[in-house]
Amino acid sequence: FQAEDGIRDSSTSRGLGDVYKRQNINIKHLCGNSSVGKHVKFYDKSLSKYKLPKILKFNKKLLKDVHIIFTALPNGEAQDISKHLSKNHTLIDLAADFRLEKASDYLKWYKQKHRATNLIKKSIYLLPEINRKEIKKYNIISCPGCYPTSILLPLFPLFKKNLIKLNNIIIDSKSGYSGAGRGVHKKYKDKNLYESLSAYGVGFHRHNSEIDQMLRKFTKKKFQFSFTPHLSPMFRGILSTIYVDLENKISQTKVLKTLISFYKNESFVKILKSGTLLSTNDVINTNNCYISCLLYTSPSPRDVEESRMPSSA
């Protein structure tokens, strides 16, 4: 595990605990920067019950006796680590270094040049419920962003089965403030995070690039969506409400049956009864994504999908 400043963010801490519980995985090294020499329990007391090594400064020599490397670093840093991988290594990156398929798109959205362009083709943007079968072909796995996960899971089946009109998709997403990173309190120092709901990145949020890239894989038709993210007064969680117009003769029942069929064998995606209203609290401290389907009848028939995720990436 290589993480910025130890294990301070919820996705890294949760991921470390989940990996430790796997009987066939042995955590060899934990790496950080200013946290070198400390125990992870200093940052997260819930990790005290696990026998974990002290945090080290990353050195490429540490890669000799490991097979899988998890990185949760500022954008750009996993690119440097990726240069030291052998054919026997698998890198799983929680940041955005390998989410985009074109180096030019990475420069456009992240305002920095990609430093491992030759490895982009050796990486995959992996959302297991959608493209799990591709995983064995690549040794660099890029985990999707939090917003795109909550958006792509509901939309994928509808795109693939041509159930919705593609010219007016409205995505309204709300995230807990942990998703804004460790510097959230400095960044929003003039706002009360606990008493405020704020839109941000309207029209140019970086996750637009991921959503657009993946939706293009689902259809050859032209499509248009508007995505508005919000920072909400909760620590973690994602609530995405997606408004779509149904194609002619497509019913809410058809949409629901399609979703159920697509995810019937997926343990982390749960499709609920039509009309069910949810809250992020329904999935807190789980790895689940709940999807609910509602019909909006005024002023025109419109299908509303809601998805809930427990944590931010």
What are these regions (language model features)?
Residues 1-20, 296-313:
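Single conserved hydrophobic/aromatic residue that forms the stacking wall/gate
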Residues 8-14, 18-195, 200, 220, ...:
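N-terminal Rossmann-like NAD(P) cofactor-binding subdomain of oxidoreductases
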Residues 122, 149-153, 202-210, 254, ...:
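Conserved active-site and cofactor/substrate-binding residues in soluble primary-metabolism enzymes
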Residues 152-159, 208-212, 256, 260, ...:
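Predominant activation on well-ordered alpha-helical scaffold segments within soluble catalytic domains
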Residues 164, 195, 206, 220, ...:
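Short gly/pro-enriched beta-turn/loop segments at secondary-structure junctions
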Residues 186-189, 221-245:
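Active-site-proximal loop/hinge segments within enzyme catalytic domains
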Residues 208, 212-227:
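Oxyanion-binding "anion nests"
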Residues 243-248, 252-298, 302:
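C-terminal active-site/capping subdomain that shapes the small-molecule cofactor and substrate pocket
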